[in-house]
Amino acid sequence: WHQRLLMMPYTWRSVGGDRPFNMLISSHRDGEIISRTIAYFGPKTIAGSTGKDKGGAAALRQILKVLKAGEVVGMTPDGPRGPRMRASDGIIQAARMANVPIFPLTYSASNRKVLGSWDRFILPLPFSRGVFHWGDPIHVDRKLDTVGIEAKRLELENSLTKLTQETDTGLGLKAIPPAGIDELPKQKRSAIAAGGNR
């Protein structure tokens, strides 16, 4: 999730080998700051989002290009503007079009500050013990229809939330909940209720 973005470059440096790693980062001002920070650790960045605007289309083309070249793309399913811990279908569409699996990944730190931003951004404090937690791959069939895409979106959302909350509680921390139903756009409320997502 977007709240766990800060430490992702460290993960890839330890497990990624020589395969190039790209992070999808918002083109907004806060995204530019994050982009410069991430670049310091080696990953490349793709500016934009997987939304349906002009910038989103350009970002999606770049994502597909690097995935088909055998590179890896890191994306925050609820970025860049939320709602918190509620996945959009952009990552599902990208995985479907590129015919690649999605690997959920999260982290937590034993001593941290939770910011008051929309995503409840996690800031690890010095001398913390950190834990990175990978989930099982999520495979996306290229022939999925709208119903199938929504099912995969919910699968990703539930899987990553469960993984994140287990990582927090495993360190003795209080789990951060997803945005409540009343915080969501109307079009997402019925889908979440139908999917049984907490």
Model-inferred region functions:
Residues 48, 76, 104-107:
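Generic beta-sheet signal
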